[in-house]
Amino acid sequence: MNLVSRYAPSPSGPLHLGNLRTALFAWLQARWSHSIFILRIDDLDGPRTVHRMAEQAIEDLTWLGLDWDQGPVNNSSNNLGDLSIKGSCGPYFQSKCDDHYTKAFNKLKESGYLYKCVCS
C-alpha cells in the first residue's frame, strides 16, 4: 500500500506559521517516503472564505519551494486565479464534493446506519 500525504488549508485568511509548519511536515513525510503529496483546499466554511486566499496559499507554498503531485496549481506567476488541476483523484476543492457526500449519506440511510446524535 502506498502512503498518501495531504495538506488542506482553509482559505479564510493568509497562511500563518502553524499552517506552514503543517504543510512542511506533510510535504517532508511524502518526499521522504517517496509517496504522493496532495494539496486539497478546505473551502467548506463559506462565510469565512476570503476571495483569492486559496490562490494566495498556492502561491505562498510554491514560493517556499513546496510542490505537490495532485491538486490545484497556479499557471502564471503574475496572475493569481489562473489555476489548473493536476492529478486524477479530485475534486481538490472540498466545496466540489457535495455529490460524493450526498451519495455516501444516502447509502448509509438506505442501509439503516444513520442514528441521531444524543450529545448535549
Language model region names:
Residues 1-119:
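N-terminal Rossmann-like or analogous alpha/beta NTP/dinucleotide-binding catalytic cores
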